[in-house]
Amino acid sequence: MRVYHSNNFRSGCKIIFENEPYLIESSEFVKPGKGQAFVRVKLRKLLTRQLIEKTFKSTDYLEIADVIEHTLCYLYNDGFFWYFINNNTFEELSVEKKIIGIQKKWLLEQDTCIVTLWNNKPILVTPNTFVEIKVIETDATLKGDTINTGVTKLAILSTGAIVRVPLFIQVGSLIKVDTRSGEYVSR
């Protein structure tokens, strides 16, 4: 069993805490004037993306999580499973709908994404930070609407996602969206 000593906790380390995989977002070593030193850590649960804050003694240690990230190409879905392929080894991987979650609205066929495996089972799918998706439905704009008004309207994308876009965006436009926030970036 490989372990991380709490003094070696660094941002990006993946650990097992309470029998689940976590990602260390940040860690701070604290040496009070009186008493034992400790490490204050922000952890992100990889299964649910929940963020928690914990304090560990400087003598504590945690097991290293057997978490592997693969860059895979999204192929298709059948409503229950999403299928991905490794372009180097041509191995196919299926991921359940509940694991895909809300990320399904950012997955386009033939796009690459990161699939995180824990004990050789998929636990998380992370799409590219920016994706270009076609607008299939939006309100018509009136002549005279300009870019500088700061006013937005709703647009439905080909993946089913709903995004606020500027007034000049029309049906059929290809727009760039930030998948982390779900916001329009550019066209």
Swiss-Prot record:
Keywords: Cytoplasm, Elongation factor, Hydroxylation, Protein biosynthesis. Transmembrane segments: none annotated. It is found in: Cytoplasm. GO terms for biological process: peptide biosynthetic process. It comes from Buchnera aphidicola subsp. Myzus persicae. This is Elongation factor P. One of its GO terms (molecular function) is translation elongation factor activity. One of its GO terms (cellular component) is cytoplasm. Its main location: cytoplasm. Pathway: Protein biosynthesis; polypeptide chain elongation. Pfam families: EFP (PF01132), EFP_N (PF08207), Elong-fact-P_C (PF09285). It comes from the Bacteria. The lineage of its organism: Bacteria, Pseudomonadati, Pseudomonadota, Gammaproteobacteria, Enterobacterales. May be beta-lysylated on the epsilon-amino group of Lys-34 by the combined action of EpmA and EpmB, and then hydroxylated on the C5 position of the same residue by EpmC (if this protein is present). Lysylation is critical for the stimulatory effect of EF-P on peptide-bond formation. The lysylation moiety may extend toward the peptidyltransferase center and stabilize the terminal 3-CCA end of the tRNA. Hydroxylation of the C5 position on Lys-34 may allow additional potential stabilizing hydrogen-bond interactions with the P-tRNA. Involved in peptide bond synthesis. Alleviates ribosome stalling that occurs when 3 or more consecutive Pro residues or the sequence PPG is present in a protein, possibly by augmenting the peptidyl transferase activity of the ribosome. Modification of Lys-34 is required for alleviation. Belongs to the elongation factor P family. The modification N6-(3,6-diaminohexanoyl)-5-hydroxylysine is found at K34. InterPro entries: Elong-fact-P_C (IPR015365), NA-bd_OB-fold (IPR012340), Rib_uL2_dom2 (IPR014722), Transl_elong_fac_P/YeiP (IPR020599), Transl_elong_KOW-like (IPR013185), Transl_elong_P/YeiP_cen (IPR001059), Transl_elong_P/YeiP_CS (IPR013852), Transl_elongation_fac_P (IPR011768).
